[in-house]
Structure formats: structure tokens, C-alpha cells
UniProtKB/Swiss-Prot annotation:
InterPro entries cross-referenced by the UniProt entry: ATP_synth_OSCP/delta_N_sf, ATPase_OSCP/dsu
A GO molecular-function annotation: proton-transporting ATP synthase activity, rotational mechanism
Gene source species: Citrifermentans bemidjiense (strain ATCC BAA-1014 / DSM 16622 / JCM 12645 / Bem)
Location in or out of the cell: Cell inner membrane
Assembly information from the UniProt record: F-type ATPases have 2 components, F(1) - the catalytic core - and F(0) - the membrane proton channel. F(1) has five subunits: alpha(3), beta(3), gamma(1), delta(1), epsilon(1). F(0) has three main subunits: a(1), b(2) and c(10-14). The alpha and beta chains form an alternating ring which encloses part of the gamma chain. F(1) is attached to F(0) by a central stalk formed by the gamma and epsilon chains, while a peripheral stalk is formed by the delta and b chains.
Protein name (database record): ATP synthase subunit delta
Transmembrane segments: none
Its biological purpose: F(1)F(0) ATP synthase produces ATP from ADP in the presence of a proton or sodium gradient. F-type ATPases consist of two structural domains, F(1) containing the extramembraneous catalytic core and F(0) containing the membrane proton channel, linked together by a central stalk and a peripheral stalk. During catalysis, ATP synthesis in the catalytic domain of F(1) is coupled via a rotary mechanism of the central stalk subunits to proton translocation. This protein is part of the stalk that links CF(0) to CF(1). It either transmits conformational changes from CF(0) to CF(1) or is implicated in proton conduction.
Membrane association type: Peripheral membrane protein
Family: Belongs to the ATPase delta chain family.
Keywords of this entry: ATP synthesis, Cell inner membrane, Cell membrane, CF(1), Hydrogen ion transport, Ion transport, Membrane, Transport
One annotated Gene Ontology cellular component of this protein: plasma membrane
């Protein structure tokens, strides 16, 4: 089974447990925090990945981290389970999948809006409102400036891309002219 499929299984189960406990958001924050720690600290990742360190040593390190970060018992149990099964390296994917499932559960989408020039707050709000109206979900928009677009905007929602950039329009015109 692929690591992505494994990550999704753990994430889906944890979202269900979090939903029952009313802790979806706090679990998400804890997972994100621990995952970032694991990703940012090469030494920590090396300890958990190195078979020379016994499982007891790894458990002690994990217990100390859980205590310092004041993680909930549910997240603590998940981390110990991943450690026992040799899957702690999958935690970043679990965290990412958890975030996606949690957003789906709460009716949130997180599109990315790229524009050739910086947009004014009123323009961003207008786009956010239009996306919320068309999707029926709460929109948390990530705005980026990409000068290569020349002008216009590109919106990415999940796997879909809505490209209204000048760069793409020019490429289409060039393609039409070349084909004659």
C-alpha cells in the first residue's frame, strides 16, 4: 500500500475521532505543529529513522516531546502507534491529509489566487465572495503575485485550475496563428 493511501487512512480515522470529540481543529493544530517539528529537525527525524536506536529510546524521546508540546492524549496515542509500526515518517502526509479532510468536514476550501500584479483588498474580497457563492463553502484564499502572468489571474481550487492570465491568452493566440 502506498504511503499516501496509508496517510489518508490514519487521517480519516483521526478526523472521525476528532469530530466525535469536538476537537477537529485542535487535533489539526497539534498534528501540524508536531509534523513541522519533525520536518524541520533533521536530528529528530534521524533518531526516529535510525534502527540503531531501540524502540524504548524512541518511546522516551516521543514521551518527552509530547509532554513539552502539551499534546492531547489522542495525538499522543497516534504518534506512539506510528512509532511502534515504523510509520512516523508518514506523519507529514497524515497531517496534510487530515487538514484536507477537516476542511471538507467544515465546508472550507483553500484556493490559491495568483495575479501578475498585486491586487487591492477590494478585488481580493470580490473574488473571495464570488468563489464562496459559486462553491457554497467558506473560502480561505491564499494570494500570490506571479509577474510571469503579465496580467489577469489564475485560481487553483484543489486539482482544478481556472486560468484567466494574459500569458495564457497570448499563448493561445500564438498557437492559433501558428496553426494558421
Amino acid at each position: 500500500m502506498s504511503t499516501n493511501a496509508i496517510a489518508k487512512r490514519y487521517a480519516k480515522a483521526l478526523v472521525q475521532l476528532g469530530s466525535e470529540a469536538g476537537s477537529v481543529d485542535s487535533f489539526n493544530a497539534e498534528l501540524t505543529r508536531f509534523s513541522a517539528l519533525l520536518t524541520d529537525s533533521r536530528d529528530l527525524s534521524a533518531v526516529f529513522a535510525n534502527p540503531a536506536y531501540g524502540i524504548e529510546s524512541k518511546r522516551e524521546v516521543m514521551k518527552e516531546l509530547v509532554a513539552k508540546l502539551q499534546l492531547s492524549p489522542m495525538i499522543s496515542n497516534l504518534l506512539m502507534l506510528l512509532l511502534e509500526r515504523g510509520r512516523i515518517s508518514v506523519l507529514p502526509q497524515i497531517s496534510e491529509s487530515y487538514g484536507a479532510f477537516a476542511d471538507e468536514l467544515s465546508g472550507v476550501i483553500r484556493p490559491t489566487l495568483s495575479s501578475g500584479l498585486p491586487l487591492e483588498a477590494s478585488q481580493i474580497e470580490e473574488i473571495r465572495s464570488a468563489l464562496a457563492k459559486s462553491t457554497g463553502k467558506k473560502v480561505e484564499l491564499k494570494v500570490e503575485v506571479d509577474p510571469s502572468l503579465i496580467g489577469g489571474v489564475v485560481t487553483k481550487i484543489g486539482g482544478k485550475v481556472f486560468d484567466g492570465s494574459v500569458r495564457t491568452q497570448l499563448a493561445r493566440i500564438q498557437d492559433i496563428l501558428q496553426k494558421g
